[in-house]
Every structure is written in C-alpha cells, then in structure tokens.
Amino acid sequence: EAEFTRSNKGISSGFMNWMYSDIWPSATWAVVDYYCEPKQAYYQMKRSYAPVVVTYVQNEQKQLQLVLLVDGLQTVTVDVNYGMRTLDGKTLWQRTATLSAEGGGADTADVTDECNAPDSYLFAEYVTDGVKHDTVFSYDMWHTCKFVSDYVYKVDKLTDCYAVTVAANQFAKGVTLKMTDNYKFTYSDNYVDLQAGEQTTLYIYGATDDDIATLEVTDFAKETA
C-alpha cells in the first residue's frame, strides 16, 4: 500500500500513518504497541519508505509493473534483475531492466510474463551505492504459498550488541526474533523474508547473556501451523 502510494504520488495526495502507537494494551492499526515494541508493520514501513526502492505495483489497468521509487534529490539509475522463483529456489523465468528516476520521481516497466503459479513469487535484485538489495512480491498476497520452517541460525556476541545470522534452505516468511520482555530491546530489523539460499544478519541491542538465553527464532510457518 505504501509503495503503491509512493508510485502514484502525483495523484494520491500522500500517505498518512493514522496511528503510530497504541494508547492502551490492545490490537489496533498502530505500528508500535502499548509497551513501545515495534509491530511487523513498523519494520515493513521502514523498508517501504527507504529513499530508493525497487518493487512491484499494479496500475489503474491492473497491469503489473516493476517500479523504481526515489525520494532523494539525485537522479538514480539501477539495473534490475527480476523474475519468478519457487519457494525452494528454482528460477522459473528471469529478465533484466534498467530504470532511472529523478529525485522525487519514479520509473516503471511492465511485467508481461506469467506470474500466478502456486508456491512461487516474484523477486527483484538491484545494487545502490555498492549495496545489494532484493524485493519479494506475491501477486495474491501469498495465499497460494505453503511455507515451511527450514532455516538455521547462529548467535555471535559483539562489542555492543548480539548478531543473529539466519540462513534459509527454503523460502522463510516473516522470520522473527523475540525474547522475554521483548519490548526492552532494539532490533536492527525483524520479521524478514529470506529466499532459499539467502542469509541475513540481524543485530540486537540492549540485551545481556541472560536475555539471549531466552531468544526464540520463529516465522510465519511456525506461528500458523
């Protein structure tokens, strides 16, 4: 929703985050709960509002498009590798596109290949400022995907934080780190999607060895089993 709004900023009149935090312990549309713990929506909004994002949206004619969104002041040009993969990592098709947008603008390319096979998703990979980024997208909000929990993780103690590295053997949806009294800690990221063969490192600040002993790594498949 946020990415669609950004791609249509000339006609959408902007995006309002209606409620930042809960005012009592309850379930609402706020992105931070009553105890000041960020919800999944908080982390997704952080990703969706990055200064430079390549993602997928549908236009008014319901045509699926690859879109580059730029909110900085400089013109950005990216070479995008995009396509469709199965949850176990098989690439069904793959294309390349070059997108370029001025600051505050957007650029699009129509996606004309088949994109509605079950247990599959669309991906987009690109590099900005020497850093590789990837986006994953489902045409039907993941309803036809049967996720499994097939990943490993390790924890390393660093000078000022703990590093948790998660490596996925199959697509891992919404990998989440949590501990007892989870609201006390700061996470560099959370509720992350990992493609098959991909790994990421998340950092936890403000925790002790005793806190880390309560660490649980879970995901969408486990939580909905």
Language model: regions and residue ranges:
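Carbohydrate-binding surfaces of carbohydrate-active enzymes
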Residues: E1-D189, L194-Y203, K222-E223
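A compact, surface-exposed functional segment
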Residues: D210-A225
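Short, charged beta-turn/beta-strand-edge "cap" motif at the junction between a beta-strand
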Residues: Y205-D209
